[in-house]
Amino acid sequence: MLSEVEFTEFQKENFSLLIDVRSPREFLHSHLIGALNFYALNDEEYQEIGMIYKKNQALAKARGASYICQNTAKHILEITQNFRIGEKVGIYCSRGGLRSKSIAVILSELGFRVVRLKGGFKAYRTFVTHYFENEINFDFFTLCGNTSCGKTELLEQLPQAINLEKIANHLGSSFGDILGKQPTQKAFEAELFHNMQNLENFAFIESESRKIGDIILPLKFYEKMQKAFKIYCFCSLENRVKRIQKIYQEKMTPLKFQQCVQKISPYISLNLRQDLLQGYERKEWQKLIVTLLEYYDKTYKKPDKIDLELNTDDILKAKEELLDHFKVQLLFFNIR
């Protein structure tokens, strides 16, 4: 069985397998969450067919069909070894054209229940873009407070939570670029959209600037965050230092530290810059961290309106206190 539906229906389906048939490079740039890449054309083939198409469309289609047949043969073998005939399979390509149709027809003939995404990945991106461009029907409860007061640690303990730093693969400050390569903007938005679709219409979230490393939060999303219920988190300096040391000490390299200090150099004195670099070289971790916290505390702007204050020295205790405060909302949605 083979059908084709709009994304609004496609996202409601419960697929045993979701296939992205675009080239590996396209897939890595961004894809539907949960999709596997069974490409119709690999990167080199896709580029070759594109160049031929500009000169001879008939030849491009013939050459492309040949490549698709070769690649599909390998993919079909892997799919039938890992999934039962009769299971539901979702499939999409770039615009809902030949690449997805060719593999979809074969899987359907084998007995899989195949659903194609009408308009392909382009239709999905249009849907996601419009979703974030419009007023978001979502309530946020925002954890704010000074650096390293346990906001992220608390967030990871909460139900109905969106961890923006995790999705962006960045810790959010000038020193936050220690986790490796960030996703593309499209991949970030795909993951954020997926997170929001799997929650009720509210979420706990950490206060962030609009820019997290190279990622930019969608404007309507950011504006909604700014208007959210504010939970001000605070804890002792001792615990803040411990948390910073736990997160950064193993991941921070000498070169990366120099680069991070360079980012804040326009805002600090030459003496402070030298103190930071020497502190790292001498491994005077606690003194170094306290110095950095003093810098960040001066730059932090406390919200004008705070709806709840929360001591986060003990994260589990803070979690229970917070959940107790929101028990009515959580009970309404049967969330524990």
Predicted regions and their residues:
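Short, polar loop motifs at secondary-structure junctions
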Residues: V21-E26, S148-G150, K166
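Positively charged, proline/Ser/Thr-rich regional signature most characteristic
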Residues: K12-F83
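Conserved NTP phosphate-binding and transfer environment spanning the P-loop NTPase/kinase superfamily
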Residues: K224-K230, F234-R336
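Long, charge-dense
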Residues: R116-T129, Q245, F257-C260
